[in-house]
């Protein structure tokens, strides 16, 4: 909402003339603690952006009108009933062909790498971006000058929404990722090795670094306690 307001103030977006922002974005990159978080959280955004558009009439004809807070008693029980009804409606939205197509066009490529890796925490939004960019590169999709939306958020219920424009050099950069190729050559480890790595007991790398940054030390004391130091290893 804040991004939309700022876009209007700065002349970037005119809601009376321009297509809604989530349709302007060719790809929507979000923080993915698990692969399908993006598509599971987006029914609310999808509804918010479209409930006043003609296309929303077709959806309400299919799944019915959305539940509104004023239709329920202003009591703890009434609030709980509304939340349950809203959750059910969110699931109905996610099953419509319109929403499925939205996810396929704008979100699906962003979740491919995450589905092979898992939670990258603060790195997951960058992984989603790499996943989409490399997928478009491999598919031969023309993305130059397209806008992409990005959304980073945390457990404190705060989020930052911003957008980017794909630059002419994107193909040359994407060609150097080799993201999915590298993922296909990973080395599996067992539970014992994983726990030793997690607890910092294992000092030797499972796989010898090869032309990449490698963790060489976890420091020290005071403000530097837990600091992770990396070096480039040929």
Question: Could you say what each language-model-derived stretch is?
Answer:
Residues 1-234:
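Terminal domain-initiation and capping elements
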């Amino acid at each position: 909402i804040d991004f939309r307001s700022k876009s209007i103030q700065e002349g970037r977006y005119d809601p009376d003339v321009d297509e809604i922002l989530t349709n302007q974005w060719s790809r929507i990159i979000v923080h993915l603690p698990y692969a399908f978080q993006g598509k599971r959280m987006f029914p609310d955004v999808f509804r918010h952006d479209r409930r006043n558009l003609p296309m929303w009439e077709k959806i309400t004809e299919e799944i019915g009108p959305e539940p509104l807070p004023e239709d329920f008693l202003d009591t703890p029980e009434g609030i709980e009933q509304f939340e349950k009804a809203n959750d059910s409606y969110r699931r109905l939205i996610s099953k419509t062909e319109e929403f499925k197509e939205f996810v396929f066009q704008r979100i699906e490529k962003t979740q491919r790498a995450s589905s092979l890796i898992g939670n990258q925490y603060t790195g997951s939004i960058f992984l989603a971006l790499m996943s989409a960019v490399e997928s478009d590169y491999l598919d031969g999709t023309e993305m130059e000058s397209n806008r992409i939306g990005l959304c980073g958020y945390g457990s404190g219920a705060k989020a930052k929404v911003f957008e980017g424009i794909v630059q002419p050099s994107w193909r040359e950069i994407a060609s150097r990722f080799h993201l999915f190729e590298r993922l296909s050559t990973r080395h599996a480890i067992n539970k014992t090795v994983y726990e030793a790595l997690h607890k910092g007991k294992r000092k030797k790398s499972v796989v010898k670094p090869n032309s990449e940054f490698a963790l060489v030390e976890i420091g020290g004391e005071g403000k530097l306690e837990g600091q992770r130091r990396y070096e480039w290893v040929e």
